[in-house]
Amino acid sequence: MKHIRNFSIIAHIDHGKSTLSDRLIQECGGLTDREMAAQVLDSMDIERERGITIKAQSVTLDYLANDGETYQLNFIDTPGHVDFSYEVSRSLAACEGALLVVDAGQGVEAQTLANCYTALEMDMDVVPVLNKIDLPQADPDRVAEEIEDIVGIEATDAVRCSAKTGIGIKDVLEVIVEQIPPPEGDPEGPLQALIIDSWFDSYLGVVSLVRIKNGILKKGDKFKVMSTGQNYNADRVGIFTPKQTDTTELKTGEVGFVIAGIKEIHGAPVGDTLTHSKHGAETPLAGFKKVKPQVYAGLFPISTDDYENFRDALNKLSLNDASLFFEPETSSALGFGFRIGFLGLLHMEIIQERLEREYNLELITTAPTVVYEIVQTNGETIYVDNPSDLPAVNNIAEMREPIVETNILVPKEYLGNVITLCIEKRGVQTNLVYHGNQVALTYELPMAEVVMDFFDRLKSTSRGYASLEYNFIRFEPADMVRLDILINGDRVDALAMIIHKGLIRSKGLALVNKMKELIPRQMFDIAVQAAVGSQIIARSSIKAMRKDVTAKCYGGDVSRKKKLLNKQKEGKKRMKQVGNVEVPQEAFLAVLKLND
């Protein structure tokens, strides 16, 4: 056991986590040069295309250290995005230490801080590594100072390496062996194994990634899942090198996979404990805190026949993604679908893309909303995440919106732009600290403003240099109303949104004009209106296409023309009563992109 090292790699987006893990794998001979591909661990197509890590992946490598001993390194490559921070905390639960990778050119960014604090809260040893020292703009000394100044961990003798060119990779491996403590646990005791991750394989059933805390799990052992009490047989156990490799047993302190032919999708939930069926452990291990979805949106299959497949796909995805929440929903405009809870907008995009690619579904998304706390006049408090579920105005005593605390790190030359943006988004500044060239800003912002397009706007006002992380703090009373869109007098439930009272005029007008562009012209006039309650705020008409019915009257009497025109008018009137308007997919998405 003293030769095992479990660690995670944590860093801000694009500071080189996945490239560093590639080098570690190559250095330790996990894959031959021929099998090597850039970002080996990013196995999903989406991850490769966007160049981001979404799922944490684990790898077991053998490393011959300078002291002549061979060490087993189990490491987990983690995502850097705000939306996936739960993935990071999950991987950290399986480790004793973490490598904090910092780009020697960019320096410390918000996510570096957020992930590092998560690790320090779990009492883990954090080892700083300065990456990308081959870049011309790299300034390792300044960055080492920044780490000490902003993060507060010793960094003067931090390892310097370049994952791209392979400089200093040996030093990184040595530091891991020296500075990260070996796992603790009782190899003789009853089995306790923590499920870090699981996914569904159509041939093998549920595959679970586990970290053995105490005891030993052998191939063929009978074990039970502690939360459900179900018993299974360990058909295969093994490790990822990063190829799936079968072994005969997993020992205390190791990280590996178990396949037990579990067919039902929620048979082995993430964060659960496995133990032997006979003489097992009495108590489960402390799991993970459940993450609450922050943003909700409706997803509907374009053809109603896909509803069943959509449900199966969501079930399979939710096994792999513990933060996904969903419940059935019906909409008069879009039919049957699901209301799904996400951690943020990136998460929402990724899930929609995975559903469309991996399960061949075609989906329509409605505008995302956050959860509001509503105190009704009868004293009851309810939580609403769907504009259609909002009670009648006269039943609402008070409406409270979620407020998040946002930490923004930005170079001082862009400070003014960022402050202007935060004020525009109804933010309240609570703190501002200068660290050398960087400024740390703390704002309290309404979550609804942050999840819509705050991240994109922040990046564009600061030329991509600002970085942010946020967490929910409380609900606060606010003047919020529901804005409805009426098409020919009918409410379209999928276009409703909850917004601040001060914005209804501008938002209503913008939305109505956008709809006017996007809804195709019909043979009759269409009225598009924005309303709050029964009060109409903005309106625009989509003019009818018109056939020239008098073209065939050459010369002739005016009464003849009048007769034809009146006949056309009657027809249009009849059409308008029975005609219904198709709202295209772009119109639903327009709600998201109002500020452009």
Swiss-Prot record:
Q: Which reaction does it catalyse?
A: GTP + H2O = GDP + phosphate + H(+)
Q: Where found? A: Cell inner membrane
Report any one BP term from Gene Ontology. Answer: positive regulation of translation
Q: What is its main location?
A: membrane
Q: Could you confirm whether the keyword S-adenosyl-L-methionine appears in this record?
A: no
Q: Which residues form the tr-type G domain?
A: 2-184
Membrane topology reported for the UniProt record: Peripheral membrane protein
Keywords from the UniProt entry = Cell inner membrane, Cell membrane, GTP-binding, Hydrolase, Membrane, Nucleotide-binding, Protein biosynthesis
Provide the family line: Belongs to the TRAFAC class translation factor GTPase superfamily. Classic translation factor GTPase family. LepA subfamily.
Q: What is this protein called?
A: Elongation factor 4
Q: Which organism is it from?
A: Shewanella pealeana (strain ATCC 700345 / ANG-SQ1)
